[in-house]
């Protein structure tokens, strides 16, 4: 539960009512650690939405109540706590069915939103590009469409804030047909954006510069690592989903190979299917990458659970079999004994600190090693000055060590991937 915020961009805050178990979960023997981990993660989600938590109501039950998720007795408890804490919004840690949402809105004094809507709200806060904003609005409308009953009445009572970003009050009060038309329009606009993205990717692929994608659970430190390796200055925040729109920057490895480093949106437990679908184009950077850096917060007690969740999402994206380097970040928060234990783990994990720079040189060498299927080679080329595209391709994918001009020819001494040199073998000259 939350009180009103001092933050200027937030008009109302939240009541956190947690029904954080799936039907039958208690009967399956869910551990106390797993439950507490879920509670802590949910608190962080609420805070990442810009909210102040005023109170919590927790519940562990064997089966979800079909009408209200938490049962009539618990509904009364939540209502009493919401009223006493003057909460504006009640946030559930589970997803609610349309029936449950309608019944809870009728029974409780504040606006009711569920886990997926909370995550969508956070995404709406961080979308900056046109594609990102279109994706968020599409995901919100598709999720809201079957849940329209009663929403207009609740929306009219709030001036904005958590659960109200993206599609506005008027939008959500329109009939199903109008929202369906808007969904159709958004899909068309996104398709246009995706065609442009596809064309840009095809131009990139014309010059064989490999892509290395950062993946990982939200708040594992991907953006901090991206900044440390590229100096790009991308927003790095302790809040969840600070990075929404993908970022691409070129870096040079110790072998002088150039690669593109991609920073992508973080994953999370029970990532809403509407988000995976809407953000599929963004996640194509993961699908197209030659190597994945699976960034993990090694100081987290739930690292193994988060690792498994990321593996699951990668498999859903069709990227589960891609070469991966496990990057154990935030090693500076561990004792020397704990650090040594990490290095002896399976799969040759790389223990680093993106914040201090510890282990980053070793990580770059490891990326080099992972890309050795296309080794860097030295070559001498004799290229007509009219072949500017050839010279540009060499500069983009490799390193020109020496350049000399003779008439209309350019003599180049280069270091580049073997595949790139192979494309221009007709310009090769014998070593002097």
Swiss-Prot record:
Mg(2+) binds at residues 223, 243. Pfam families: GTP-bdg_M, GTP-bdg_N, MMR_HSR1. It is found in: Cytoplasm. Gene3D superfamilies: 6.10.250.2860, GTPase HflX, N-terminal domain (3.40.50.11060), P-loop containing nucleotide triphosphate hydrolases (3.40.50.300). Keywords: Cytoplasm, GTP-binding, Magnesium, Metal-binding, Nucleotide-binding. Residues 1-33, 154-173 are annotated as: Disordered. GO terms for cellular component: cytoplasm. Residues 1-10 have a biased composition (Low complexity). Its cofactor is Mg(2+). Residues 210-375 form the Hflx-type G domain. The keyword Nucleotide-binding applies. One of its GO terms (molecular function) is GTPase activity. GTPase that associates with the 50S ribosomal subunit and may have a role during protein synthesis or ribosome biogenesis. Monomer. Associates with the 50S ribosomal subunit. This is GTPase HflX. It comes from Acidobacterium capsulatum (strain ATCC 51196 / DSM 11244 / BCRC 80197 / JCM 7670 / NBRC 15755 / NCIMB 13165 / 161). The lineage of its organism: Bacteria, Pseudomonadati, Acidobacteriota, Terriglobia, Terriglobales.
């Amino acid at each position: 539960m939350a009180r009103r915020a001092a933050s200027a961009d937030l008009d109302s805050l939240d009541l956190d009512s947690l029904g954080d178990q799936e039907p039958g979960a208690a009967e399956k023997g869910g551990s106390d650690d797993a439950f507490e981990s879920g509670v802590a993660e949910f608190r962080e989600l609420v805070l990442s939405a810009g909210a102040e938590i005023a109170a919590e109501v927790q519940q562990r039950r064997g089966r979800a109540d079909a009408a209200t998720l938490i049962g009539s007795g618990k509904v009364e408890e939540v209502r009493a706590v919401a009223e006493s804490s003057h909460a504006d919004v009640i946030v559930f840690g589970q997803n609610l069915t349309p029936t449950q949402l309608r019944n809870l809105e009728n029974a409780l004094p504040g606006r009711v939103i569920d886990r997926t809507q909370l995550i969508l709200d956070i995404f709406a806060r961080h979308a900056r590009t046109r594609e990102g904003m279109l994706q968020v609005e599409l995901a919100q409308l598709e999720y809201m469409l079957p849940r329209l009953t009663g929403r207009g009445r609740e929306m009219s009572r709030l001036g904005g804030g958590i659960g109200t970003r993206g599609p506005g009050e008027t939008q959500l009060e329109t009939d199903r047909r109008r929202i369906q038309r808007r969904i159709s329009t958004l899909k068309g606009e996104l398709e246009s954006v995706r065609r442009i993205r596809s064309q840009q990717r095809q131009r990139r692929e014309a010059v064989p510069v490999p892509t290395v994608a950062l993946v990982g659970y939200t708040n594992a430190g991907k953006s901090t690592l991206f900044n440390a390796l590229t100096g790009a200055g991308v927003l790095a925040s302790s809040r969840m989903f600070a990075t929404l729109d993908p970022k691409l920057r070129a870096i040079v490895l110790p072998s002088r190979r150039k690669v593109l480093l991609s920073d992508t949106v973080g994953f999370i437990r029970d990532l809403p299917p509407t988000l995976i679908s809407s953000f599929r184009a963004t996640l194509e950077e993961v699908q197209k990458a030659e190597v994945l850096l699976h960034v993990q917060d090694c100081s987290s007690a739930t690292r193994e659970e988060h690792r498994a969740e990321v593996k699951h999402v990668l498999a859903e994206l069709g990227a589960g079999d891609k070469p991966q380097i496990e990057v154990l970040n935030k090693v500076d928060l561990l004792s020397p004994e704990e650090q040594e234990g990490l290095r002896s783990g399976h799969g040759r994990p790389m223990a680093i600190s993106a914040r201090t720079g510890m282990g980053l040189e070793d990580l770059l060498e490891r990326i080099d090693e992972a890309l050795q299927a296309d080794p860097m080679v030295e070559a001498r080329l004799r290229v007509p000055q009219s072949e500017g595209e050839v010279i540009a391709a060499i500069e983009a994918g490799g390193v020109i060590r020496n350049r000399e001009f003779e008439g209309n020819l350019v003599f180049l001494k280069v270091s580049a991937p073997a595949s790139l040199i192979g494309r221009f073998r007709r310009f090769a000259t014998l070593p002097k």
